[in-house]
Amino acid sequence: MRMSDGAAPKANGSEASGQDLVPAAVEQAVPIQPVAGAALAAPAAGQINQIDPWIFQNFVQCPLGEFSISPRNTPGEILFDLALGPGLNPYLAHLSAMYTGWVGNMEVQLVLAGNAFTAGKVVVALVPPYFPKGSLTTAQITCFPHVMCDVRTLEPIQLPLLDVRRVLWHATQDQEESMRLVCMLYTPLRTNSPGDESFVVSGRLLSKPAADFNFVYLTPPIERTIYRMVDLPVIQPRLCTHARWPAPVYGLLVDPSLPSNPQWQNGRVHVDGTLLGTTPISGSWVSCFAAEAAYKFQSGTGEVATFTLIEQDGSAYVPGDRAAPLGYPDFSGQLEIEVQTETTKTGDKLKVTTFEMILGPTTNADQAPYQGRVFASVTAAASLDLVDGRVRAVPRSIYGFQDTIPEYNDGLLVPLAPPIGPFLPGEVLLRFRTYMRQIDTADAAAEAIDCALPQEFVSWFASNAFTVQSEALLLRYRNTLTGQLLFECKLYNEGYIALSYSGSGPLTFPTDGIFEVVSWVPRLYQLASVGSLATGRMLKQ
């Protein structure tokens, strides 16, 4: 073995077996042409930016570049506030995952869908980094580089978005402050229409990288989480299940006369999949509960059942961050429940017993589902000889229904899901309605009960866990038979749908349509109003 470079090679060793295969006289250098662009790429240590020229030449809509203006907006209200960066362009946002940093300017194009019958101005300004934008007024924003835009402008307005920075390049993963494009309503929106009908002017923001925009430093391939674009199940509301009562959805409506901020505990879910209150994932759990039952006959009352609650999957219920086990009824009244019971009577081993259970809002039965204990009773002249054991109670009918939260902890405080809301002025909650079986000697109509989302939507969001990119999703509801667009609405991240409706009475929509996802929009996005002929013509597509 050779121990040093100075050691003489052995004549018959393994290292000498490959020597002198080519005579020295025949050896010559093989000419190699230089790689094209090697000199240009050398200072960047192999970091070559490959942005397609088409991306530099064409404007595309920004991911959050959709906004609207209506007479409800007040001067000084910010319509959009977007930062310079790859996130301003869908192509650059996709490419930025491969690079460590970016640098350079961008160009934006503002398109307003105005008409000759409206008047108003918006101001678009470039706000430098680290400037507090929360206190901007209409007077202060004109101190920055800005452009005044009339809503009657037909041609797109093009603006440069300069990269003002204090670093050599921006890291794609850091929230480094950069130049921001802020659009503010400068003067109120007015119309010469004799009526007071609400109207909306829509706007779009498009972007493209400037010629000096560039990415720097390729990142090594790493395992990343794949984020799905938010979508909705393609299912008509009439085929969905109600989220607060085990029945199909029979109606879709808005009604300004009903409470605008109900505090329902079932049918509540965030767009990111976070369940609120006592909302279950399975529709078979709605308004039901499981328990260990103990029966006792009381003279003058009948058979009294004491239910020690458990979760409906059989696991133990632990009081904590919700008011009751999952699926427990979230309304008040006298509920009739059916329980599969076992008796000691000969020839009557199994039977279905109907108990009456007072849910609230206040009771004398000391109902405390938060602590895992509720009571129910059935009128009987003698003991029913029921056998204690595990049961599952399902609702049958309701008497004295009240759409308020039941008694959860014998009058004491419990953790509750927050009320639904807030809404912008003119917005009304979209309600999914079904009807409960009711026992009443005076009113023969079934009792209506509403929910914020169908149970299929709740299960969809809970199982997909979408990534939230803004404060609301712009949706459109389309009739599947005629193809007509019935209304547009916003699905807020908190899990409720809002419409713009100026009427005073209820407005019902057909349940054979489907919801379509349009884009992410800010909370202040103004919706086109429904319920008027002119607006209906405007929404048709």
Swiss-Prot record:
Q: Where is this region: Protruding domain?
A: 225-541
Q: Which UniProt keywords apply?
A: Host cytoplasm, Virion
Main subcellular localization, coarse class?
A: virion
Give a Gene Ontology cellular component term annotated to this protein: host cell cytoplasm
Map out region (P1 sub-domain 2) in residue numbers: 417-541
Q: Where is this region: Interaction with host receptor CD300LF?
A: 298-366
The region called Shell domain is annotated at 1-224
One Pfam family, please name it: Calici_coat_C
Task: Give the subcellular location.
Answer: Virion; Host cytoplasm
Task: Report the domain of life of the source organism.
Answer: Viruses
Coiled-coil blocks: none
Segments of this protein annotated with the region P2 sub-domain: 278-416
Q: Region P1 sub-domain 1: which residues?
A: 225-277
Please indicate if the UniProt record lists Heme as a keyword: no
* Family assignment from sequence similarity: Belongs to the caliciviridae capsid protein family.
Provide the function of this protein. Capsid protein self assembles to form an icosahedral capsid with a T=3 symmetry, about 38 nm in diameter, and consisting of 180 capsid proteins. A smaller form of capsid with a diameter of 23 nm might be capsid proteins assembled as icosahedron with T=1 symmetry. The capsid encapsulates the genomic RNA and is decorated with VP2 proteins. Mediates virion attachment to the host cell receptor CD300LF.
Domain comment, in the record's words?
The shell domain (S domain) contains elements essential for the formation of the icosahedron. The Protruding domain (P domain) is divided into sub-domains P1 and P2. P domain interacts in dimeric contacts that increase the stability of the capsid and form the protrusions on the virion. An hypervariable region in P2 is thought to play an important role in receptor binding and immune reactivity.
Quaternary structure and partners: Homodimer. Homomultimer. Interacts with the minor capsid protein VP2. Interacts (via P2 subdomain) with host receptor CD300LF (via N-terminus); this interaction requires Mg(2+) and Ca(2+), and allows viral binding and entry into the host cell. Stochioimetry is 2:2. Bile acids interact with the P domain dimer interface and act as cofactors enhancing virus binding and infectivity. Interacts with host receptor CD300LD; this interaction allows viral binding and entry into the host cell.
Name under which the protein is recorded: Capsid protein VP1
Q: Which organism is it from?
A: Norovirus (isolate Mouse/NoV/United States/MNV1/2002/GV) (MNV-1)
